[in-house]
UniProtKB/Swiss-Prot annotation:
<dbReference type="InterPro" id="IPR013159">
    <property type="entry name" value="DnaA_C"/>
</dbReference>
<keyword id="KW-0446">Lipid-binding</keyword>
<comment type="similarity">
    <text>Belongs to the DnaA family.</text>
</comment>
<feature type="region of interest" description="Domain IV, binds dsDNA">
    <location>
        <begin position="348"/>
        <end position="467"/>
    </location>
</feature>
<comment type="subunit">
    <text>Oligomerizes as a right-handed, spiral filament on DNA at oriC.</text>
</comment>
<feature type="region of interest" description="Domain III, AAA+ region">
    <location>
        <begin position="131"/>
        <end position="347"/>
    </location>
</feature>
<feature type="compositionally biased region" description="Low complexity">
    <location>
        <begin position="97"/>
        <end position="111"/>
    </location>
</feature>
<dbReference type="InterPro" id="IPR003593">
    <property type="entry name" value="AAA+_ATPase"/>
</dbReference>
<dbReference type="GO" id="GO:0005886">
    <property type="term" value="C:plasma membrane"/>
</dbReference>
<dbReference type="InterPro" id="IPR020591">
    <property type="entry name" value="Chromosome_initiator_DnaA-like"/>
</dbReference>
<feature type="region of interest" description="Domain II">
    <location>
        <begin position="91"/>
        <end position="130"/>
    </location>
</feature>
<feature type="binding site">
    <location>
        <position position="179"/>
    </location>
    <ligand>
        <name>ATP</name>
    </ligand>
</feature>
<dbReference type="InterPro" id="IPR001957">
    <property type="entry name" value="Chromosome_initiator_DnaA"/>
</dbReference>
<dbReference type="Pfam" id="PF08299">
    <property type="entry name" value="Bac_DnaA_C"/>
</dbReference>
<dbReference type="InterPro" id="IPR027417">
    <property type="entry name" value="P-loop_NTPase"/>
</dbReference>
<dbReference type="InterPro" id="IPR024633">
    <property type="entry name" value="DnaA_N_dom"/>
</dbReference>
<keyword id="KW-0238">DNA-binding</keyword>
C-alpha cells in the first residue's frame, strides 16, 4: 500500500464532488501513509473540521472500496507534510489551472525567501491607504447556502493569506456581498497582523492611479507601491475591460504579487472567462487559485439578513413581517436592506408599529413593481429564450432532456420568484400536478450543488428576471 492509494481517492473524489468543493477542501490536504494509517494534514483547524464533518464518510468509503478489510485507519491533523503533499498530477485540469497555462505561471518564491506573514514589517513610506471598511466583518456577514462557500474561502484567506487560495476570485450579481467579504478579509488579516499592508480598492482606482503616475512620470513609484503590498483586494475587475495599458500593468503586478506569495482577491459580476474586453492571459490567471460564485440569497437567508439588520438598528421586526418582505424582494441583499431602511424610517416618522399591512403601505410601489416584473408568463418566455426552445415546448408533454431540464428550471424559478402555490404553477405548465412541480424544484436544487453549468444558468436567469 502506498500514497498511490490517496491518488486513487483523489481521482474518485474529483469525479464525485463539484469542482469548487474539490479545489477548496480536498486539494489543500496533504497525505502520509504509515503503519496502516492514512494521515491527512489540513492547513488549519477550519479546513480540518470542515473536511471531517462533510467528507469523512466519502473518504472512508473509498478506502474500503479500494482495500476492503485491509483499509487503513484515517487520521486528521493540522499541519504540513511537504514530502507527501497531494500531487498536482493526481487531479485533472478542470479543477487546476490548465496544463498549458501552468507552464507559463511564474515560479512562486519558496517560503524561506520571504518571511511574509510570520514577520510582517512595520509600514514603510509611502503610507498605504488601506481603505478597508471596519464595519464589514465576518461576524456581521449573514451566511446561507448561496454564499457559504464564498464566505468559507474568504475566511480561509484571512487566516492564511498567500496560501492555497491565491488568487481568490469571487463573482456574482450586484449587491450579493462580494464587497463585504473583501473588507471582511482585509479586517481579518489586519486583526491578525496589524502592520500588514492591506489595500482595498475599486478597479477604477487602480486605473486612475496608473494614469496619474504616467502623467507625473512616476510609474516606477506606482509599481513599487502596488507590488509591495501584502494583500491587494480589487473590486469589480470587469472595469478593466478594453483598458489595454491598465491590463498590461496589472498583468505584471499580478505576477509580481504571486511570486512573492502576496494575497490577491478579485471580484466581478461574472465568471472570469465571461468577462469581455479582458485579455485571455489575465482571465487564465484569475482562475489559478480558487473561483467561487455568490448566488442571490435563498428565502431563509433573506429572512436572516432582515432580522440581523433590524437587530443592528434596535428594531423589533416580527418574523412574519421579515418573511413577507423576503418572499417579495429576491434579487439581492442591497435591495433588501434598502427596503428595510425605508420601512424603519416610515415607522419612526409615523410612530406606527411594523406590521404586514404597514409594510404593504410603506413599500407599495416597490412591491407592485416586483410583481409586475416577475410573472410565470415572463419566466416561461425568459427560460425558453435562454435555452433556445419554444414556450410551447415547456407546456408540452415532451420528456427529452433538452425540454425537460428547462421546464424544471422554469418551475423552480416560478416557485422562487413568484407567490404562486405549487398547484398554480403546475396549472401554468400544461396542467401538471403539484408533485411534479415539487420534484422539479428539488431536482434543480440538487443539480445546482452538483453542476457548475446548472448553477450558472440559475444565477443568470435570476439576474435577468430580477433586473
Amino acid at each position: 500500500m502506498s500514497l498511490s492509494l490517496w491518488q486513487q481517492c483523489l481521482a474518485r473524489l474529483q469525479d464525485e464532488l463539484p469542482a469548487t468543493e474539490f479545489s477548496m477542501w480536498i486539494r489543500p490536504l496533504q497525505a502520509e501513509l504509515s503503519d496502516n494509517t492514512l494521515a491527512l494534514y489540513a492547513p488549519n483547524r477550519f479546513v480540518l473540521d470542515w473536511v471531517r464533518d462533510k467528507y469523512l464518510n466519502n473518504i472512508n468509503g473509498l478506502l474500503t472500496s479500494f482495500c476492503g478489510a485491509d483499509a487503513p485507519q484515517l487520521r486528521f491533523e493540522v499541519g504540513t507534510k511537504s514530502v507527501t503533499q497531494t500531487p498536482q498530477a493526481a487531479v485533472t485540469s478542470n479543477v487546476a489551472a490548465p496544463a498549458q497555462v501552468a507552464q507559463t505561471q511564474p515560479q512562486r518564491a519558496a517560503p524561506s525567501t520571504r518571511s511574509g506573514w510570520d514577520n510582517v514589517p512595520a509600514p514603510a513610506e509611502p503610507t498605504y491607504r488601506s481603505n478597508v471598511n471596519v464595519k464589514h466583518t465576518f461576524d456581521n456577514f449573514v451566511e446561507g447556502k448561496s454564499n457559504q462557500l464564498a464566505r468559507a474561502a474568504a475566511r480561509q484567506v484571512a487566516d492564511n493569506p498567500g496560501g492555497a487560495y491565491n488568487p481568490l476570485f469571487l463573482y456574482g450579481g450586484t449587491g450579493l456581498g462580494k464587497t463585504h467579504l473583501l473588507h471582511a478579509v482585509g479586517n481579518g488579516i489586519m486583526a491578525r497582523k496589524p502592520n500588514a499592508k492591506v489595500v482595498y480598492m475599486h478597479s477604477e482606482r487602480f486605473v486612475q492611479d496608473m494614469v496619474k503616475a504616467l502623467q507625473n512620470n512616476a510609474i516606477e513609484e506606482f509599481k513599487r507601491y502596488y507590488r509591495s503590498v501584502d494583500a491587494l483586494l480589487i473590486d469589480d475587475i470587469q472595469f478593466f475591460a478594453n483598458k489595454e495599458r491598465s491590463q498590461e500593468e496589472f498583468f505584471h503586478t499580478f505576477n509580481a504579487l504571486l511570486e512573492g506569495n502576496q494575497q490577491i482577491i478579485l471580484t466581478s459580476d461574472r465568471y472570469p472567462k465571461e468577462i469581455n474586453g479582458v485579455e485571455d492571459r489575465l482571465k487564465s490567471r484569475f482562475g489559478w487559485g480558487l473561483t467561487v460564485a455568490i448566488e442571490p440569497p435563498e428565502l431563509e437567508t433573506r429572512v436572516a439578513i432582515l432580522m440581523k439588520k433590524a437587530d443592528e438598528n434596535d428594531i423589533r421586526l416580527p418574523g412574519e413581517v421579515a418573511f413577507f418582505i423576503a418572499k417579495r424582494l429576491r434579487s439581492n441583499v442591497r435591495e433588501l436592506e434598502g427596503a428595510l431602511n425605508r420601512v424603519i424610517a416610515n415607522a419612526n416618522f409615523t410612530g406606527r408599529a411594523i406590521t404586514i399591512d404597514f409594510v404593504r403601505e410603506a413599500l407599495r410601489d416597490l412591491l407592485a413593481l416586483q410583481e409586475k416584473l416577475v410573472t410565470i408568463d415572463n419566466i416561461q418566455k425568459t427560460v425558453a429564450e435562454y435555452y433556445k426552445i419554444k414556450v410551447a415546448d415547456l407546456l408540452s408533454k415532451r420528456r427529452s432532456r433538452s425540454v425537460a431540464r428547462p421546464r424544471q428550471m422554469a418551475m423552480a424559478l416560478a416557485k422562487e420568484l413568484t407567490n404562486h402555490s405549487l398547484p398554480e404553477i403546475g396549472d401554468a405548465f400544461g396542467g401538471r400536478d403539484h408533485t411534479t412541480v415539487l420534484h422539479a424544484c428539488r431536482k434543480i436544487e440538487q443539480l445546482r450543488e452538483e453542476s457548475h453549468d446548472i448553477k450558472e444558468d440559475f444565477s443568470n436567469l435570476i439576474r435577468t428576471l430580477s433586473s
